[in-house]
Design a protein with these regions (language model features):
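N-terminal type II signal-anchor transmembrane helix
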Residues: 47-112, 158, 172-175, 202-238, ...
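N-terminal, intrinsically disordered, polar/charged segments of Gram-positive cell-envelope systems
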Residues: 88-138, 163
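Long, charged all-alpha helical bundle/coiled-coil segments in cytosolic proteins
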Residues: 123, 128-195
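Short beta-strand and strand-turn-strand segments in soluble, beta-rich domains
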Residues: 579-585
Length: 595
């Protein structure tokens, strides 16, 4: 079954991009095409370039030797003996440069191994290498050479590089050693949690050294060395830049992360495991909910329980459900577990927090939402998880297992009366087992990988956050993971959402495809876009026959629910058409036009 809805909306912006959202989890496939021909062409060109570089280095070396030889003659040392001394002086500088490079490499190796003793030893050796080169340039022959303009530039370049390497040692490596000594990474994990003090020590270190690294790397790449040593510059800068390679990816989320963990003071967050098989506009039904608690400076992830045991049965009056929300989302807003019919996750999370506080008498500082797609992404880096019934979840199958396989294993046409509760327990177990494995096997070297899972989820609304404090919530918005409706006219988006209203598990079989046509510029400068949203039920006859009512719902496999389409901020919706003859109604929610 497939239903199409065609709408035209006008965007008051003269220009801007529009995006559609498909809020259901599934598999994503991509392919890469590699051209062997271009690879070989590039390789041949590179070899030719290297040949030219060798010739150029040889010319520079001859020129350098000639200049030094002339200087020796000028100070009374001539002939073959003078040339021999000149050659030795140049060779000494080159050898000292290679020693410097090796010592810097040892510093980086020590840091990578998180070995403060090895790093400090390498820093000491690096300082000696720098001092040796400076002593060489203090010789009379090099001081005389410094008076020659061209040679002066070369010597200045070498000294500039030495200063930058010295900065790398004193301003980057040694401060890192101090933190490694004061806050060894072995102290990061405390029983089943994480030390906030240790985390904050390394976050502060990264914030301190990152701009210094940027400065050093930029300055190094502008240094022009003599004697064919320019190739070393790239090696130096790459080694130093590698110190914060993961941080470069993480820094857009760093303000949010620091806000989330705070200074170690007590905090409580809800961790909602949403199930997209019962799809909702804000992700999925929150089948199980756990906690993230910070107590006495230690962050721990608590057990997960069924949403029915965790949230109050009725939405607290403090939520102040509006008449507009009742009109849009019906009676579903009366139960906090169903608040996610509202596509505005900020509102949904607030209601969940109130409902948790009412039932558990514990204040909530924020809410984090996870879906099966995020669990699958995490398993790629923490390894497989095996459930108590023997089901193995991997980075290849978790989404399908959690949204399809488990239901057809236990809730098929021959399901027992208690099978539903058993499956709910397996979902709660999945969330807890995944979080426990993340904690027990946590590897700081994989921070960049963990970030990728989080950032990818933030982009497609499979991970969302809400913070009670309004200032802290701004960090969530800036990181792009608030899950709120887009009210920014400078970044217009079309929102397409669906919520299943019948108790069933048919979300796996729902396909949503949104197409946005080319813009038509109107006389007043606004633009009109033709938007087509296609909703398809891809339930096969075989799956229908094998499924029990818990999966199929009250209508034998027919998907029923709420469709909401939001115009971009500042835009309108007109000329609504439906392929099945159904009626669509327009209205306004959070200042956005919707149907």
């Amino acid at each position: 079954m497939s239903e199409d809805f065609e709408i035209l909306y006008s965007d008051s912006k003269e220009s801007g991009s529009q995006h559609s959202h498909h809020h259901s989890d599934g598999e994503h496939h991509s392919s890469h095409h590699h051209s062997d021909e271009s690879h070989h062409s590039s390789h041949h060109h590179g070899s030719h370039r290297h040949s030219k570089q060798r010739k150029r280095r040889k010319r520079i070396l001859i020129i350098t030797l000639s200049i030094v030889a002339c200087l020796l003659i000028a100070i009374g040392v001539g002939g073959a003996y003078g040339y021999k001394i000149a050659k030795r002086e140049v060779a000494d500088v080159k050898q000292q440069a290679y020693t410097l490079k090796a010592d810097l490499k040892n510093v980086m190796a020590g840091l990578k191994a998180q070995d403060p003793v090895a790093t400090e030893t390498a820093c000491d050796q690096l300082d000696v290498a720098i001092e040796d080169i400076n002593k060489t340039f203090d010789k009379k022959i090099w001081k005389t050479a410094y008076k020659i303009p061209k040679f002066k530039g070369y010597i200045d370049s070498v000294k500039e590089l030495l200063n930058l390497v010295q900065e790398a040692s004193s301003d980057i490596a040694r401060p890192t050693v101090a933190v490694l000594n004061d806050y060894p990474l072995s102290g990061l994990k405390v029983d089943d949690g994480f030390s906030i003090t240790t985390i904050n020590a390394y976050l502060s270190l990264l914030e301190d050294i990152e701009p210094k690294i940027d400065h050093i790397v930029t300055a190094m790449n502008q240094v022009n060395l003599p004697m064919g040593l320019n190739s070393m510059i790239a090696d130096y800068s790459v080694q130093i830049a590698s110190m914060t390679g993961s941080y470069d990816n993480l820094k857009e989320f760093l303000p949010l992360f620091k806000t989330f963990i705070g200074d170690g003071s007590d905090r409580t967050y809800l961790l909602a495991a949403q199930n997209s098989s019962e799809i909702r506009a804000s992700g999925g039904f929150p089948g199980s909910i756990g906690t993230i608690r910070i107590r006495d400076g230690v962050l721990t992830i608590g057990n997960f329980s069924s949403v029915y045991k965790v949230l109050a049965s009725y939405t607290p009056s403090a939520a102040n459900i509006t008449a507009e929300e009742k009109e849009l989302f019906g009676s579903w807003m009366n139960g906090p577990r169903d608040a996610c019919f509202d596509p505005d996750f900020e509102r949904v999370a607030y209601i969940w927090a109130l409902a948790y506080e009412q039932k558990n008498s514990e204040h909530v500082n924020g809410v984090v939402s996870l879906t099966p797609a995020i669990i699958q992404g995490m398993l790629e880096y923490i390894g497989n998880v095996t459930l108590s019934d023997g089901t193995e979840l991997t980075s290849e199958n978790a989404t399908k297992v959690l949204q399809y396989d488990l239901y057809y294993k236990y809730l098929n046409a021959n399901a027992s009366a208690t099978a539903g509760d058993y499956v709910d327990d397996l979902f709660a177990e999945t969330a807890k087992a995944t979080m426990s494995k993340l904690v027990s096997d946590f590897d700081v070297k994989k921070a960049g990988d963990y970030y990728k899972v989080f950032s990818d989820g933030a982009k497609n609304r499979t991970v969302m956050m809400w913070m009670e404090d309004e200032e802290e919530q701004e960090f969530v918005k800036n990181a792009g993971c608030s899950g709120g409706l887009n009210e920014d006219p400078e970044n217009p988006e079309t929102g397409v959402y669906f919520s299943i209203s019948d108790p069933c598990k048919l979300g796996w079989f729902l396909d949503i495809d949104t197409e946005i046509g080319e813009p038509v510029v109107n006389d007043d400068g606004t633009r009109t876009y033709d938007v087509t949203a296609t909703y398809s039920n891809v339930l096969s006859n075989a799956d229908k026959v094998n499924a029990g009512n818990y999966i199929l719902g009250s209508y034998g496999g027919t998907i029923t629910g709420y469709i909401h389409i939001f115009a971009p901020a500042g835009g309108t919706i007109s000329d609504i058409k439906t392929s099945n003859g159904g009626r669509m109604y327009t209205g306004t929610y959070l200042s956005l036009i919707h149907i």
